[in-house]
Design a protein with these regions (language model features):
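Rossmann-like S-adenosyl-L-methionine
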Residues: 1-8, 163-168, 172-432
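Nucleotide donor/acceptor-binding cores
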Residues: 74, 152, 269-270
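Short, aliphatic-rich beta-strand segments
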Residues: 81, 144, 150-159, 222-226, ...
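Short, solvent-exposed loop/turn segments that connect beta-strands within catalytic domains
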Residues: 83-87, 148-151, 216-220, 317
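General beta-strand recognition
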Residues: 88-90, 153, 385
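Short, acidic/hydrophobic/Gly-rich beta-strand patch recurrent on exposed beta strands
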Residues: 90-94, 155, 306
């Protein structure tokens, strides 16, 4: 089922100009020739149709959030092709040829500025681009992330760790070419297959984290990204998602205790479990608003970054109650509810170590899966905040959750000019 989008261009509406698309050299932005309001209308129509069976009321949908047309993508994964003296940074284009995309209009300004300098740096280091057709060469990708303050994380993905010596030697030169470089690392991916990165990460810089300070409902929340951590690729969209979580959860759980945007002061502290928490975006936003939070994430590096953010919040004088655990979300939720002596389903609500008032899930594209959906359905939780980059898997999960209905929802255009988008929904257990 594809988006119901016409490809006709409206004469009155300006479109994003891209020479790569016009020349047929890159078609990653499949909807580039569709007006952005038409793109968004199609995404809204698809989300409404798929979630209609679970909507508790006709007016659950807020107006969709529209992304900037350009310069919104805070992370790029650039394939390194060409030669050691003249590298290209971009994609594998038509016919399997490397296509340089240093003038792509989608990345944030700092990434656009850094890309030509990174190509020069690679040439000065003499790194031979990896050729997947003959398994020769060394440098596979360069992954660049920009923070809201303009600092960069630069990751070089190579087939062997031997290039680290040159990276250490040339770090000063890299910072001359790219002054915004804060975190620099080498990822080792030795295998000859379509895998972006490997498990081994070698820090080249002294700094190990990229601070991402966001505006969440008017309050600053700083997340710390480590090289292998996940973060949404559109910073403005991430701020919208976290703000909706704080606002919507307050509306249904903490309306009697809010003080200046806070959930503090409730007779019974409001507790949330943030499953698939990543570096803690949703959980830290809720903790900053006064909730007690436990975040669960399989990737230990992300959990370490989330804990670092908690310590920084406390050092800044914020009274936050949050903990983050490295574990599989489904296994942890089942084990925790059993540990409390409430069996696999109903749990006690209350303190930081007790069952939650709210469950937050922000899973990968495949969704939370039947096991976790059925656990939520059988638990005593009444409120779920579900954020999804795949509304189809979200609908399948809601079907497995049975008694929950959508009471608030919004389409967030995280990935402009493509068929992909984020959907955030507040779910309540239906009564009667």
């Amino acid at each position: 089922m594809r988006l119901p989008l016409p490809v006709r261009v409206a004469d009155h509406e300006p479109l994003l100009d891209c020479s790569y698309f016009d020349a047929g050299l890159c078609r990653s932005c499949t909807l580039l020739k569709t007006p952005q309001d038409t793109q968004l209308a199609g995404k809204q129509a698809l989300a409404e149709s798929l979630l209609a069976p679970f909507a508790g009321r006709a007016d659950v949908w807020e107006a969709p959030w529209a992304s900037s047309r350009e310069a919104f993508r805070n992370k790029v994964k650039l394939v390194v092709t060409g030669t050691a003296t003249k590298p290209n940074l971009g994609i594998i284009g038509p016919g399997g040829r490397g296509q340089d995309l240093r003038d792509c209009p989608l990345p944030t300004p700092g990434i656009q500025l850094a890309t030509p300098a990174l190509a020069q740096f690679i040439a000065e280091c003499g790194f031979r681009p990896y050729d997947h057709t003959n398994d020769r060469g060394v440098l596979k990708f360069v992954i660049v992330t920009e923070s809201p303050t303009g600092e960069l994380m630069i990751r070089f993905v190579a087939r062997r760790r031997g290039v680290r010596g040159m990276l250490f030697k040339m770090l000063g030169r890299l910072r001359e070419l790219v002054p915004a470089a804060r975190v620099v690392s080498l990822n080792v991916q030795p295998e000859r297959k379509a895998v972006l990165e490997g498990s081994e990460e070698i820090l080249i810089s002294a700094q190990s984290t990229l601070p991402m300070t966001l505006d969440v409902s008017g309050q600053p929340v700083t997340l710390n990204l480590r090289p292998q951590s996940f973060f949404q690729t559109n910073t403005d969209a991430a701020q919208v998602l976290y703000s909706r979580a704080v606002e919507w959860v307050h509306d249904v759980v903490g309306s009697s205790s809010r003080r200046s945007g806070s959930l503090r002061g409730a007779a019974k502290p409001v507790t949330a479990w943030d499953l698939y928490c990543g570096v803690g975006g949703f959980g830290l936003a809720l903790a900053g608003a006064g909730m007690r939070v436990i975040g669960v994430e399989a990737q230990e590096q992300a959990v370490g970054a989330a804990r670092e953010s908690v310590e920084e919040m406390r050092a800044a004088g914020l009274d936050v109650e949050a903990d983050f655990v490295a574990a599989d979300a489904t296994e942890w939720a089942r084990a925790e509810s059993s540990r409390q002596g409430a069996g696999p389903g109903v749990m006690r609500a209350g303190g930081l170590g007790a069952g939650p008032d709210v469950v937050v899930v922000n899973p990968p594209r495949r969704g939370i899966g039947r096991d976790l959906a059925e656990w939520i359905a059988g638990s005593g939780v009444d409120t779920v905040l579900y954020s999804s980059c795949n509304v189809r898997s979200m609908a399948a999960d809601l079907a497995a959750m049975r008694d929950f209905e959508v009471v608030k929802a919004q389409v967030v255009d995280m990935f402009a000019h493509t068929e992909h988008f984020e959907t955030v929904a507040l779910l309540k257990r239906a009564r009667g």
